[in-house]
Design a protein with these regions (language model features):
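Structured core of small recognition/catalytic domains
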Residues: 117, 186-187, 195
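Helix N-cap/coil-helix junction residues
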Residues: 24, 184-185
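Alpha-helical transmembrane segments in multi-pass membrane proteins
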Residues: 4, 8, 12, 16, ...
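Juxtamembrane transmembrane-helix boundary motif
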Residues: 50-159, 181
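Periplasmic/extracellular electron-transfer cofactor-ligation site
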Residues: 173
């Protein structure tokens, strides 16, 4: 709950592995943690709603892609469950996804520490421009003050929804870094928007 309100994550990336380590079968750990994420995300969203620290337009676009991604994830989950391989899939998914995200964040942390030690002042943009920013259907998100292709949040939602369905997480541990580095949203709007998306994605799971 504390992590949910502070960082905009549901906490599933911590609780689901913890439940598995306690001896609970992965298939049940995923289902149980989805309920916990839904409750904590709803509470956090209400708080950010009253504080007006949410970008609803961005959130709805991510949700649109998220519901489709969740549907694909459920199909994948059902397939591997049918061939009795779902436990292995969940374990491998956690290992690879957390390792990849952790390595990127570790790299950024080391670079920032090195920059501080060298006392180098770098004026940088909110986010780096990648090929994905050249996609069509650009739209203005006035709350976040960004001008971005509508396909970016939709594609992000598909990825988040797919991972959420398989791993039993809200996907915020992936969504929050993407909002910062890929979309360039203001930090103050990210927790509320992330929790808002998590309600619908996890609820569909």
């Amino acid at each position: 709950g504390f992590l949910s309100g502070l960082f905009g994550v549901g906490g599933g990336f911590l609780m689901t592995p913890f439940l598995i380590f306690m001896g609970i079968p992965p298939i049940y750990a995923v289902a149980n943690e989805a309920n916990n994420i839904l409750a904590s995300s709803t509470s956090g969203t209400l708080t950010h709603w009253f504080k007006k620290t949410m970008d609803l337009k961005m959130g709805w676009m991510i949700i649109g892609g998220g519901l489709f991604g969740t549907f694909l994830g459920i199909l994948t989950f059902s397939y591997f469950k049918g061939i009795n391989k779902i436990d292995i899939v969940i374990a491998l998914a956690y290992m690879y996804v957390l390792a990849i995200i952790g390595s990127f964040m570790l790299r950024d942390g080391i670079m920032e520490i090195d920059r501080i030690k060298k006392k180098v002042i770098i004026k940088k943009k909110l986010h780096t421009h990648y090929w994905i920013h050249g996609l069509p259907f650009r739209t203005r998100f006035r709350t976040s003050k960004v001008y971005e292709s509508a396909l970016v949040p939709v594609l992000l939602g598909i990825l988040v929804g797919y991972i959420a369905a398989i791993m039993g997480v809200g996907g915020a541990f992936l969504m929050v870094p993407a909002m910062i580095y890929l979309i360039g949203m203001p930090i103050k709007l990210i927790p509320g928007t992330s929790l808002f998306v998590t309600i619908f994605v996890t609820g569909f799971v």
